[in-house]
Amino acid sequence: MLYPLLRPLLFKFDAETAHEHTLKMLDRAHRLHLTPLAASPAARQPVQAMGLTFPNPVGLAAGLDKNGAHIDALAALGFGFIEIGTVTPRPQDGNPKPRLFRLPEHEAIINRMGFNNHGVAALLDNVRRSKFKGVLGINIGKNAITPIENAVDDYLACLDQVYAAASYVTVNISSPNTKNLRQLQQGDELGRLLAALKQRQLALADQHGRYVPLAVKIAPDLDDEQIAEIARLLTGNGIDGVIATNTTLSRREVAGHPLESEAGGLSGAPVRARSTEVIRKLHKELGGAMPIIGVGGILSGNDAVEKLDAGASLVQLYSGLIYRGPELVGECARATAQYLQARN
């Protein structure tokens, strides 16, 4: 209710400063028990996926709360699950500023953040301080200084550390803002990475007496052959879920915009159709072998339903929150609940 009034003020700041201010305001509102003024109630529609029970299928995508410093305030908005990160083994600053740009005419964002985060130890401190008892995903990546041939070491180091704190762990191999990272989506390299992660996951499950599912986040910039190969490797290595999709390098939908040439990943409305197309093709290739979490360009309840209709079991929001505000969470939860009830 308040966000339409606040948005013009926030948009006077550069995008990254506005992001920081918004999170501080949410924290303050949560402490003062004022969150209901910012968000509408979310419908309860439990979904079973990856062996977990999600109160509703609408989650927060990774990237908004990289360090897990705002979990409680964000959870109070009505999300069915929260995903924090991307986190790397060691702290890193990310790419030079400016690195986050709004394209309001397209309801889009370009970012080249570069996995800026305080490191896995700091994230875990924040998780321990949180009171949140719901489904918490932790998204892991590699440090920029780690050679791509040693990337598996960073992913394993993160997995070791976050395992006990996470409801599920997401392996981010699709950010366009870490040099050569998307190479890890390719056949042999992806196969080796997934095999190593699966082996470690099973060892950690024995060690902790608890199985924590692994999901992999993929890019929208994949052809049909690549989608089929990724589906085969995910299934063959016993991965528990897949998140489709990350941001796109394509600028076709924003051609002619003054910021078109800014480097980084494009998100928001322009990626909606491509993300949904990847979900539909991935769903066909997987044949129900694992759940898909659909993300990309969700700015309305209808957009969320579109992802479920294409084959996703769950959805996630990020850029839509920047343009629509916290009310989007409840809108998507109500729309998806209505869709799932009608389907069942």
UniProtKB/Swiss-Prot annotation:
Residues that, per the record, bind FMN: A62, G63, L64, D65, K66, T86, N139, N172, K217, T245, G268, G297, Y318, S319
Cofactor: FMN
UniProt-recorded Gene Ontology molecular function terms: dihydroorotate dehydrogenase (quinone) activity
Residue positions of the active site: S175 (nucleophile)
Pfam families reported for this sequence: DHO_dh (PF01180)
Catalysed reactions, semicolon-separated: (S)-dihydroorotate + a quinone = orotate + a quinol
Biological or metabolic pathway of the protein: Pyrimidine metabolism; UMP biosynthesis via de novo pathway; orotate from (S)-dihydroorotate (quinone route): step 1/1
A GO BP entry: 'de novo' UMP biosynthetic process
CDD domains on file: DHOD_2_like (cd04738)
E.C. no: 1.3.5.2
Subunit structure: Monomer.
Family stated for the protein in its record: Belongs to the dihydroorotate dehydrogenase family. Type 2 subfamily.
UniProt cross-references to PANTHER family, sorted A to Z: DIHYDROOROTATE DEHYDROGENASE (QUINONE), MITOCHONDRIAL, DIHYDROOROTATE DEHYDROGENASE (QUINONE), MITOCHONDRIAL-RELATED
Function: Catalyzes the conversion of dihydroorotate to orotate with quinone as electron acceptor.
Protein's UniProt name: Dihydroorotate dehydrogenase (quinone)
Organism: Chromobacterium violaceum (strain ATCC 12472 / DSM 30191 / JCM 1249 / CCUG 213 / NBRC 12614 / NCIMB 9131 / NCTC 9757 / MK)
Lineage: Bacteria, Pseudomonadati, Pseudomonadota, Betaproteobacteria, Neisseriales
Name of the encoding gene: pyrD
